[in-house]
């Protein structure tokens, strides 16, 4: 069975930098520990995605269309994050960081001026910041195992909330059956975001009806 856009599938994957085989993305907890990448705040295990809807990096997402359920693939992506842009490398005085009680060191990722940057070097009272994507200019390889297609609307909707709204599973609860569902959320979200979610959900699950409810005991923002 070939995968189509808007199909919900369960997958496992490992993403590696082609030049040195270093792992940067994965779903396997044991491998994360072995590679010293384990993060106790990260959710490991098979992931449910909606194909073609940006749940993965664009080049990988597009590459899944036409693949077969139950098979494993090695997918090479040529420079998916674009070339490095030298204008995105900035030099700042170390005093700017000490004022914010930040001790900069090479490899540290920080939010600067609303953008994610990586500290490349610290010397002579200066800090070199790189605002390029950490994988800019690199070819990568994903080893993808396509476990199964997901048909259950409840599982689809849970995955859609996590992937589209960026909400952790312990921050919401989806209830309902067949085509009618309620999403209980701990913190209210803007109406525009709710409407956008419903619109996107209707595109990929045209038969369902969704309403948001603030969980009992939560404070409406």
Language-model segment annotations:
Residues 1-221:
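FKBP-type peptidyl-prolyl cis-trans isomerases
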């Amino acid at each position: 069975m070939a995968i189509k856009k808007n199909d919900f599938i369960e997958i496992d994957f490992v993403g590696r930098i082609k030049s040195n085989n270093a792992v940067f993305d994965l779903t396997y907890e044991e491998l994360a520990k072995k590679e010293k990448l384990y993060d106790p705040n990260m959710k490991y295990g098979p992931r449910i995605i909606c194909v073609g809807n940006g749940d993965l990096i664009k080049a990988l997402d597009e590459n899944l269309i036409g693949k077969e359920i139950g098979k494993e693939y090695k997918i090479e992506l040529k420079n998916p994050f674009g070339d490095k842009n030298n204008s995105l490398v900035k030099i700042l005085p170390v005093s700017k960081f000490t004022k914010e009680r930040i001790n900069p060191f090479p490899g540290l990722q920080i939010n600067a001026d609303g953008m994610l940057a990586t500290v490349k070097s610290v010397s002579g009272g200066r800090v070199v910041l790189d605002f390029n994507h950490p994988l800019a200019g690199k070819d990568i390889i994903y080893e993808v195992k396509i476990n199964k297609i997901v048909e259950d609307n409840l599982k689809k909707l849970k995955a859609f909330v996590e992937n589209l709204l960026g909400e952790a599973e312990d921050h919401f609860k989806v209830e309902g059956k067949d085509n009618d569902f309620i999403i209980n959320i701990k913190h209210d979200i803007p109406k525009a975001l709710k409407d956008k979610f419903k619109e996107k959900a209707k595109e990929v699950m045209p038969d369902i009806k969704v309403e948001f409810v603030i969980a009992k005991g939560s404070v409406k923002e």
